[in-house]
């Protein structure tokens, strides 16, 4: 049968008086304002108090053609009481087109051979990366200031990316993180790119704690030897039946690598990739009771 998104709607009302026969409406739109569904959820008295159940929205998903970010807006008609929430819709089944891509979790001999011959390699390195392991990434940002809390994690403050890059064609995103990134970013290892040159830019850059500001990230593409490489520390594979955002990002990556758009602009030496698995930066234990501006670390 048809797949529906079913959403219960509750209203907390703390106005001066109860609302009589209030009519509550909804609409579901995409990023361009196209309306996919709208209507009346219910009409009822809304007493003063918390979480008054109004009704539910049943939204059919069969007409959503591809992965998409949508927004549901709920309003008490005739008032300025309105709220809205983003949500993401992904295909129920996913086919991975990966015949011409060698997938591995390290820079092994076969990966080197394929890159030498001009092939495509996807390295899903995860926790095997050592250069960057001192940086602890949560989905939530740095608490207040790492210099006042003895470098306790988390050490990052979100991500930065170009949402128009073709790698994200099938994974709708803004230039920053949003809730669809939770299962991908929370506690994901990062890579440090301090030796990759000042102009090097990963496709998904993690933003370091501001008073150290290392160049770090979780996914990059590069021309390596004679081939093309994408390397990531994100978990794209585990429990795909539950982690549907991770599953969708994996599809988007593989489809991009199989497309004519896969032309990395940056060149990286094979030794630089290898050092991500061997080099260790160490943890800068920087701590001050003064203003964090007094800390001027020299990060090598």
Give residue ranges: language-model regions.
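Catalytic beta-strand/loop cores that center a nucleophilic Ser/Cys/Thr
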Residues: 127-132, 147-244, 261-300
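Short, small-residue-biased leader/transition segments that mark boundaries at the very start
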Residues: 3-4
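Short, aromatic- and glycine-rich surface loops/edge beta-strands on solvent-exposed regions
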Residues: 65-78
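Short alpha-beta junction capping motif
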Residues: 99-146, 223-226, 232, 253-256, ...
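Intrinsically disordered, low-complexity Pro/Gly/Ser/Thr-rich segments with frequent PxxP/GP/PP motifs
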Residues: 34-65
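Short beta-strand elements
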Residues: 42-45, 80-96
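Low-complexity, Pro/Ser/Thr- and charge-rich linker/hinge segments at domain boundaries
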Residues: 88-106, 264
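A short beta-turn/strand-edge loop motif at beta-sheet boundaries
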Residues: 14-21
């Amino acid at each position: 049968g048809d797949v529906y998104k079913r959403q219960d709607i509750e209203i907390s009302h703390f106005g001066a008086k109860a609302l009589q026969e209030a009519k509550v409406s909804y609409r579901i739109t995409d990023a361009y304002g196209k309306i996919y569904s709208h209507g009346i959820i219910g009409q009822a008295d809304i007493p003063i108090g918390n979480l008054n159940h109004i009704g539910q929205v049943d939204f059919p998903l069969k007409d959503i053609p591809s992965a998409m970010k949508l927004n549901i807006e709920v309003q008490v008609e005739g008032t300025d009481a309105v709220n809205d929430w983003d949500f993401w819709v992904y295909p129920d089944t996913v086919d991975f087109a990966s015949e011409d891509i060698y997938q591995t979790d390290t820079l092994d001999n076969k990966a080197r051979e394929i890159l030498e011959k001009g092939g495509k390699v996807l390295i899903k390195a995860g926790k095997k990366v050592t250069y960057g392991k001192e940086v602890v990434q949560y989905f939530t940002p740095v608490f207040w200031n790492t210099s006042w809390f003895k470098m306790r994690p988390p050490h990052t403050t979100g991500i930065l990316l170009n949402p128009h890059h073709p790698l994200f064609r099938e994974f709708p995103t803004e230039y920053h993180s949003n809730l669809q990134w939770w299962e991908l970013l929370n506690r994901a290892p990062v890579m440090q790119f301090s030796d990759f040159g000042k102009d090097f830019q990963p496709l998904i850059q993690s933003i370091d704690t501001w008073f150290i500001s290392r160049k770090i990230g979780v996914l990059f593409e590069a021309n390596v030897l004679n081939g093309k490489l994408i390397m990531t520390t994100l978990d794209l594979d585990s429990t795909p039946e539950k982690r549907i955002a991770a599953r969708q990002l994996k599809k988007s990556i593989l489809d991009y690598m199989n497309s004519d758009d896969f032309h990395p602009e940056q060149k990286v030496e094979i030794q630089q990739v290898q050092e991500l698995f061997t080099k260790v930066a160490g943890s800068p234990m920087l701590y001050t009771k003064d203003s964090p501006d007094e800390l001027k670390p020299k990060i090598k």
